[in-house]
Amino acid sequence: MVAVAGEIGKGGIPMAKAWHLTSRPQGLPTIDNFALREVPDGPLEKDQLRIRNLWLSVDPYMRGRMNDAKSYAASFQIDQPMTGGAIGEVIESRMEGFAPGDLILHMGGWRDGGVIGLDMMPNKLPGDMLAAGLTPQTFLHNMGLTGGTAWIGLLRVAAAKPGDTIFVSAAAGAVGSAVVQIAKAREMTVIGS
């Protein structure tokens, strides 16, 4: 059976499909390190949303999470659904401030949908920005984790100001390229590698 988020599975239980890490990659990950499996969706409890994912983010930091090593982000657990940034549509809500049809950014990605709670940090996409022409996917990069990391690192941590000269290592990477764009827009001189 091919399940779609919210589809009824065996025994009348709603099902979703989620990617699971089945083994730790040695070098580059291969399809053999992953499995797409059905996961029970269940009825909603307080502070939960049933969502249908529209876009998933695949970010460089996720490769590090496939290792069993201490890092700034917790390792993916073997045979458990993988998480990551995603844009989803709310199908059903028992969480204050969220209604069916809302588009959200959350960390319960790598699945077609399902039930998420507050631990997956759902945030409603700003309707005014969507109406102004920003696409929902923008909130997975420059208006999301990537852009937020660049913004905070450059303007709050480094406290860079117009006229400063900054050096950006990995200027071609996701966060580095966002730092370069923000710095140039704020009239800084950028040296990148």
Predicted regions and their residues:
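N-terminal Rossmann-fold NAD(P) dinucleotide-binding loop
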Residues: 176-177
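Adenosine-nucleotide cofactor-binding segment
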Residues: 184-193
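A short N-terminal beta-strand-loop micro-motif at the entrance of redox/enzyme domains
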Residues: 3-9, 25-54, 81
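Short structural boundary motif marking the start of a folded domain
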Residues: 12-19
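Residues that mark the start of a beta-strand
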Residues: 17, 48-50, 165
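NAD(P)H dinucleotide-binding glycine-rich loop of Rossmann-like/cofactor-binding domains
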Residues: 84-89, 96, 100-170
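Glycine-rich beta-strand-centered segment in the early N-terminal region that forms part
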Residues: 40-58, 66-110
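Gly/Ala-rich phosphate-binding loop of Rossmann-like dinucleotide-binding domains
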Residues: 150, 180, 184
